[in-house]
A protein has these predicted regions:
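Boundary/entry segment of secreted carbohydrate-active catalytic domains
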Residues: 27-61
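Active-site mouth loops of central-metabolism enzymes
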Residues: 34-41, 116-122, 270-277
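Substrate-binding cleft and catalytic face of glycoside hydrolase catalytic domains
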Residues: 50-215, 219-225
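Glycoside hydrolase catalytic-domain groove-lining segments
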Residues: 223-270, 292-293, 297-301
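Aromatic/acidic polysaccharide-binding cleft in carbohydrate-active enzymes
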Residues: 261-330, 339-345
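Carbohydrate-binding surface patches
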Residues: 341-373, 380-382
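C-terminal beta-strand-rich structural cap/linker in extracellular carbohydrate-active enzymes
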Residues: 385-423
Length: 423
């Protein structure tokens, strides 16, 4: 993304939920890296007011052409500072290797962001030199390297899926040689512009298969349309998972969502929308809950900054979106889980003896029976109140957590200090 720019009512208990259709379970606990972020001012030392586990370096002044400003001219200050600051915060780093510098562009009219010629296909020689320079300098500090941003859009990539697969293969060999523990992440593809997605994504997977899958991660961007909701995003994820299965992507390759927000205008004449209050908190928390249900390894929220005209949900201190993000982190981080999709989605966290439970409706509404051990419920705005086991609770798009007072106290102790929501 360029910076300019719930059904029928049911009554369900925990036991029933865990034997329903479409369960999702994990062998290990949810890692903090699930919670990704974009931080445009990272090089200046900005520290977000939420817990997060990974950062994607894009739209932060460190793109290829801003670092390598000529064939033999490098300006490393911004990238060095961004990596140092991310390391000091203890978060995993993803670096996006594209886009083509103006000086290396064969056609300077192809792409304008973040500079002229950015969508042009670079020469293999220039690409090798660049990737080698980055990996040799920062190998061991960067956790994953993403090949390109939104390569299904001609604003960012004017080449073919085959050419992108070639760049992917070339970069992967260099990364495996000099930074073998790092992950290689495919070029990302947006989903909401379906014509561009269908033109690029299946073909790119086909070409990656031909060169023996030189990636560890398949990446997409799951922004829904300007008037879209988390339900629409969930449909996109199902579509991507189906295509990955059809393309016979090995099960060892994770799916990451490397950009997400809501309310961004388009495609076409679809207007954007500003999303605040309870809706912002609910949708943000739903995003990360849906990830564990759908098998998405990470989502990088776009982005931590002041309110602007581009994005529907503001991610900033005190805003509901940030509180929803932080609350989801508090509930999920380091938890084992078992989830069930339905009209009311149910995720059991922790052990089966005294579980914590999170429930929400992706579409419509329903009811849920408070589990036997639960005495407290909290919503995604982190508002908590007492409940009685066996009571029937109305469930909508606002995720609700159920557990004991002791479990809630432990959760609350993980929160960072931040301003009380007011916007």
């Amino acid at each position: 993304m360029r910076r300019a720019l719930v059904a029928s009512v049911i009554s369900i208990g925990l036991a029933a939920s865990l034997i329903s259709a479409n369960p999702a379970a994990a062998d290990g606990p949810i890692n903090a890296t699930q919670f990704g972020m974009h931080i445009p001012q990272l090089s200046q030392g900005l520290v977000p007011g939420v817990n997060y586990g990974s950062v994607r370096l894009w739209d932060s002044g460190v793109a290829w052409g801003l670092v390598q400003q000529g064939k033999n001219k490098f300006w490393w200050n911004g990238l060095d500072a961004s990596i140092a600051n991310a390391n000091s915060q203890g978060v995993d780093i993803m670096y996006v290797l594209g886009s083509t510098p103006t000086w290396a562009a064969t056609n300077k009219k192809q792409g304008t962001y973040p500079y002229k010629g950015a969508a042009s296909v670079p020469s293999t020689k220039d690409w090798k030199k660049w990737v080698t320079a980055v990996v040799k300098r920062h190998g061991g500090s960067i956790g994953s390297y993403q090949i390109w941003n939104e390569a299904n859009l001609t604003d960012f990539w004017a080449g073919t899926p085959k050419q992108m697969a070639k760049l992917t293969q070339v970069a992967s060999k260099i990364i495996r040689k000099y930074d073998p523990t790092a992950k290689v992440v495919s070029a990302s593809s947006t989903v909401r512009l379906q014509s561009a997605y269908k033109r690029f994504f299946p073909a790119y997977l086909k070409e990656l298969k031909k060169v023996k899958w030189p990636v560890d991660v398949i990446s997409v961007h799951t922004y829904p349309k300007g008037n879209g909701t988390p339900e629409d995003r969930s449909i996109y994820i199902d579509q991507v998972n189906a295509q990955m299965k059809k393309s016979k992507v090995p099960a060892s390759k994770q799916l990451w969502d490397t950009e997400v927000n809501y309310g961004i205008k388009g495609p076409g004449k679809i207007k954007g929308q500003k999303i605040g209050g309870d809706t912002a908190a609910a949708w943000t928390a739903q995003t990360y809950l849906e990830n564990i249900v759908k098998g998405v390894g990470r989502s990088y929220w776009y982005f931590w900054d002041a309110p602007n005209s581009l994005l529907g949900i503001t991610m900033q201190d005190g805003y509901p979106g940030a509180i929803g993000y932080q609350t989801a982190y508090m509930w999920l981080n380091n938890s084992f889980y078992s989830c069930t999709e339905g009209n009311v989605n149910v995720c059991q966290l922790g052990d089966a003896v005294q579980p914590e439970v999170v429930v929400w409706a992706t579409q419509g509404s329903g009811t849920y029976t408070v589990p036997a051990n639960a005495t407290v419920q909290c919503d995604a705005m982190n508002r908590c109140s007492a409940v009685t086991p066996g009571d029937s609770i109305a469930i909508g798009s606002m995720p609700l957590w159920f557990g004991t007072a002791e479990q809630n106290a432990t959760n609350q102790a993980t929160l960072l200090n931040r301003p009380v929501a007011s916007p």
